[in-house]
């Protein structure tokens, strides 16, 4: 069955604590991951929290990559969602997990848009 998108949710544990709290490293890693996966980067926004932790998003033409890091737990919550078949989200997730030096990871891929994609809209989209 065809899907409109692929959404990978990654739970990364036992990550490098310093890297989880380094906004420049996280930002660069996520942009690299998007490019390596074949995506076109549109916007990049990352925000540090006090006393530690980072949340951020890389908006790609094909959807997005996000992170919420919890250095105090050695944990990062990662989402990589891609539309179409040009981008491989698994490449992005692997790059991120390797860069963060995660020794324990759980990954789940969710096919998106498998529902009634041929349904008629209730309203016309302008």
Swiss-Prot record:
Gene3D superfamilies: 3.30.160.750, S-adenosylmethionine decarboxylase domain. GO terms for biological process: spermidine biosynthetic process. The active site is at residues 63, 68, 83. Its EC number is 4.1.1.50. Keywords: Autocatalytic cleavage, Decarboxylase, Lyase, Polyamine biosynthesis, Pyruvate, S-adenosyl-L-methionine, Schiff base, Spermidine biosynthesis, Zymogen. The record marks 62-63 as: Cleavage (non-hydrolytic). Its cofactor is pyruvate. Binds 1 pyruvoyl group covalently per subunit. It catalyses: S-adenosyl-L-methionine + H(+) = S-adenosyl 3-(methylsulfanyl)propylamine + CO2. It comes from the Bacteria. Signal peptide: none annotated. The keyword Nucleus does not apply. GO terms for molecular function: adenosylmethionine decarboxylase activity. The modification Pyruvic acid (Ser) is found at residue 63. Belongs to the prokaryotic AdoMetDC family. Type 1 subfamily. Heterotetramer of two alpha and two beta chains arranged as a dimer of alpha/beta heterodimers. This is S-adenosylmethionine decarboxylase proenzyme. The gene is speH.
